[in-house]
């Protein structure tokens, strides 16, 4: 060994910059460096070490000299030191042996860096964040974790955690040039380790940030990221194969929307994999939709203010337990849709906001970068790396969790620059308009990428305006979504039902108007969580009248939804008419169905169960949802009696007549025109006793005769009980 005094010293300014984590190239100081053709220097910093030795590849052991500030160094033989290990003698007597974190090449290649800066890296989670990695060296395999983070405005970045006493001086990262990415491979750190990134700004501030790409996070209110790697073995090959060939336009889709923390409070992902899956299967739904399951700091946001886009929330278990839940749904024949929130994110100091001291993920101008109503930041959709972060995140949930659909939240807030903004609070686009052109491009790219890479996966827009082409293909200039929530239908329908039956005749347009635009987009009919919060009450309380009328109203409402063109969605608890408004802080009120007082609620639940079974067995109710040939009115103008009827036509030639009486009077002999003569069989009556109805006028078969009526060549006469709906199947 050569004395350290013969080593050219590192400049004090560099050592100081390293100590305060404001140096871009720690690998240029620490690690192994050639001195001349025969010698090399090994230099390392280990805070709290008493002695450090290096074990060379020829089995030589060399002690490194302490040169101050926890730095140890020695000159060693060049050939024997190309690979080495460090033996660290810590204060207190502990001895550890490890590879040197500063003796490895970058774990990101040039192609990775190019794709990231172009915004085109579709597997971003495999190269950024914390990825457990094994690197093969001359002295054997080295297990550890490759860390990488995008922080282009930082003056220095370090990995911190219990493994270094949360001291950023121990593991500063290197900057990979103009890419803005900082990288470091740390040996002997693996799955389960809590970590953060210490971001140092040019203004001298230190920001301890959770990893934007973390695959697991601590349970809130803790904010650390956790190194994670999946060991889950999927058992849904058949489901995934069949999904790729599914045409959702022409298949049944009945969605049960769920907040996992309140469906039955206290259950984790693994318990829900039995209890929730069994319930959804028993009820006959085709799909379940989770309110956001990405990590979020505030439970009261229901998951819509995301801090960890790649980390399933730890409130209800581990990422692999979530995989188990989704797998269980697939094995039960049920698809899984997840709410996804690319519109905005919270301002919590540990998360994405001002990530490297400046606006990074958010737009730098507050007139585009903040959503004042929600107190959140808005993503900078025009920035390549940000767009890549979001598109890759969509793919991540599809790839890593086998999710079958993404319901994209708050799309309208993305599309319009003046969304919920007063004059002077927004910036127009380059053409002077209010359309957010960058957000449009992002949504088109996301949808095109998802549909190309994962055939059969759905993307569903929550879009509350009349923006054209939401569900039109991107190659036609549309946004490219598979479906769109029909907010207009939902608002008009609930407004109509909120009136006393005697007054509904004055609001008849509310219940018929939806068919004017029913085929302008591909729609989902949503009675979602948004309709049972913020003082709106439950669907039960929004029905007028006493308990009998409320129950009859809900039964009729649900039958109308299932018969109307469009896919169906119902939020948890509404399937049995929960009385109280929903709260994320408590379980559903399953007790509403108990005892004699619960008979109406049990009846509603039975009706929804029967509607799901009937719906799935009736192509007329779903196979032409997006084809005008799948629908015709048979009575749309009887406002005085609050009666509505129409026929749904299946692609297989089947036909179902839907008849609704939204009023309070029975109609024992009501004549309707129909497209076919012969027998029409009653397959559902919401007034039946099994649903706790009055059991009045229960037709089983009705004959249509060759008598012209209302423009049809055939007609029939039906009994229509007050506040009820009936479905009749044509049997020729």
Curated annotation (Swiss-Prot):
Gene3D superfamilies: Glycosidases (3.20.20.80), Golgi alpha-mannosidase II (2.60.40.1180), Immunoglobulins (2.60.40.10). SUPFAM superfamilies: (Trans)glycosidases, E set domains, Glycosyl hydrolase domain. It holds the Pfam family Alpha-amylase_C. CDD domains: AmyAc_Glg_BE, E_set_GBE_prok_N. Pathway: Glycan biosynthesis; glycogen biosynthesis. The active site is at 409 (nucleophile), 462 (proton donor). It catalyses: Transfers a segment of a (1->4)-alpha-D-glucan chain to a primary hydroxy group in a similar glucan chain. Belongs to the glycosyl hydrolase 13 family. GlgB subfamily. Catalyzes the formation of the alpha-1,6-glucosidic linkages in glycogen by scission of a 1,4-alpha-linked oligosaccharide from growing alpha-1,4-glucan chains and the subsequent attachment of the oligosaccharide to the alpha-1,6 position. Monomer. This is 1,4-alpha-glucan branching enzyme GlgB. It comes from Corynebacterium diphtheriae (strain ATCC 700971 / NCTC 13129 / Biotype gravis).
């Amino acid at each position: 060994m050569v004395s350290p005094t013969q080593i050219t010293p590192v400049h004090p300014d560099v050592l100081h910059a390293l100590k305060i984590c404001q140096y871009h190239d720690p690998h240029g100081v620490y690690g192994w460096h050639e001195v001349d053709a025969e010698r090399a220097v090994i230099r390392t910093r280990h805070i709290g070490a008493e002695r450090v030795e290096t074990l060379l590849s020829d089995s030589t052991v060399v002690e490194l000299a302490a040169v101050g500030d926890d730095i140890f160094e020695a000159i060693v033989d060049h050939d024997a030191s190309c690979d080495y290990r460090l033996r660290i003698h810590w204060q207190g007597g502990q001895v550890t042996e490890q590879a040197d974190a500063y003796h490895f090449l970058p774990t990101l290649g040039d192609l990775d860096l190019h794709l990231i800066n172009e915004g085109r890296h579709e597997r971003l989670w495999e190269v950024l964040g914390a990825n457990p990695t094994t690197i093969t060296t001359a002295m054997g395999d080295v297990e550890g974790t490759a860390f990488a983070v995008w922080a282009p405005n930082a003056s220095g970045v370090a990995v911190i955690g219990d493994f270094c006493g949360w001291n950023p001086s121990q593991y500063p990262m290197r900057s990979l040039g103009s890419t803005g990415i900082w990288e470091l491979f740390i040996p002997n750190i693996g799955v389960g380790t809590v970590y953060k990134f210490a971001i140092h700004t040019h203004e001298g501030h230190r920001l301890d940030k959770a990893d934007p790409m973390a695959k697991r996070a601590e349970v809130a209110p803790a904010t650390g990221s956790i190194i994670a790697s999946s060991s889950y073995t999927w058992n849904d090959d058949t489901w995934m194969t069949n999904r790729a060939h599914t045409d959702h336009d022409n298949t049944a889709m009945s969605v049960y929307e769920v907040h996992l923390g309140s469906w039955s409070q206290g259950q984790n992902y693994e318990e829900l994999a039995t209890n929730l899956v069994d319930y959804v299967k028993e009820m006959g739904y085709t799909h379940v939709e989770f309110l956001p399951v990405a990590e979020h700091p505030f439970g009261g946001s229901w998951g819509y203010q995301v801090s960890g886009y790649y980390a399933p929330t730890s409130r209800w278990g581990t990422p692999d337990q979530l995989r188990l839940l989704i797998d269980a749904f697939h094995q039960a024949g049920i698809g899984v849709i997840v709410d996804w929130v690319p519109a905005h994110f919270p301002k919590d100091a540990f998360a994405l906001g001002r990530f490297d001291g400046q606006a990074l993920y958010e737009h730098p101008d507050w007139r585009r970068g903040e959503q004042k109503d929600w107190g959140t930041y808005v993503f900078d959709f025009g920035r390549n790396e940000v767009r890549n972060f979001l598109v890759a995140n969509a793919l991540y949930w599809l790839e890593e969790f086998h999710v079958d659909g993404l319901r994209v939240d708050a799309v309208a807030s993305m599309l319009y620059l003046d969304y919920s903004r007063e004059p002077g609070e927004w910036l127009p686009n380059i053409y002077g308009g209010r359309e957010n052109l960058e957000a449009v491009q992002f949504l088109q790219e996301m949808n095109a990428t998802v549909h190309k890479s994962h055939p059969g996966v759905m993307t569903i827009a929550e879009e509350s305006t009349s923006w054209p082409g939401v569900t039109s293909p991107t190659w036609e200039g549309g946004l490219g979504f598979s479906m769109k929530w029909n907010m207009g239908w939902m608002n008009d329908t609930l407004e109509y039902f909120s009136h006393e039956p005697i007054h509904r005749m004055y609001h008849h347009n509310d219940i018929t108007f939806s068919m004017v635009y029913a085929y302008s987009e591909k729609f989902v009919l949503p009675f979602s969580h948004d309709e049972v919060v913020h003082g709106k009450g439950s669907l039960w309380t929004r029905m007028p009248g006493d308990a009998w009328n409320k129950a009859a109203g809900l039964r009729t409402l649900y039958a109308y939804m299932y018969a109307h063109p469009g896919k169906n969605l119902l939020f948890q608890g509404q399937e049995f008419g929960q009385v109280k408004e929903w709260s994320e802080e408590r379980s559903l009120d399953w007790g509403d169905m108990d005892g004699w007082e619960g008979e109406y609620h049990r009846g509603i639940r039975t009706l929804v169960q029967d509607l799901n079974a009937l719906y799935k067995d009736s192509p007329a109710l779903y196979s032409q949802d997006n084809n005008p040939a799948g629908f015709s009115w048979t009575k749309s103008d009887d406002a005085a009696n609050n009666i509505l009827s129409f026929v749904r036509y299946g692609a297989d030639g089947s036909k179902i007549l839907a008849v609704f009486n939204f009023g309070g009077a029975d109609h024992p002999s009501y004549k309707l025109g129909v497209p076919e003569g012969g027998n029409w069989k009653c397959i559902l009556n919401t007034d039946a006793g099994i649903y706790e109805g009055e059991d009045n006028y229960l037709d089983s078969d009705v004959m249509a005769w060759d008598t012209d009526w209302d423009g049809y060549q055939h007609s029939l006469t039906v009994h229509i009980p007050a506040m009820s709906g009936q479905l009749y199947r044509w049997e020729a």
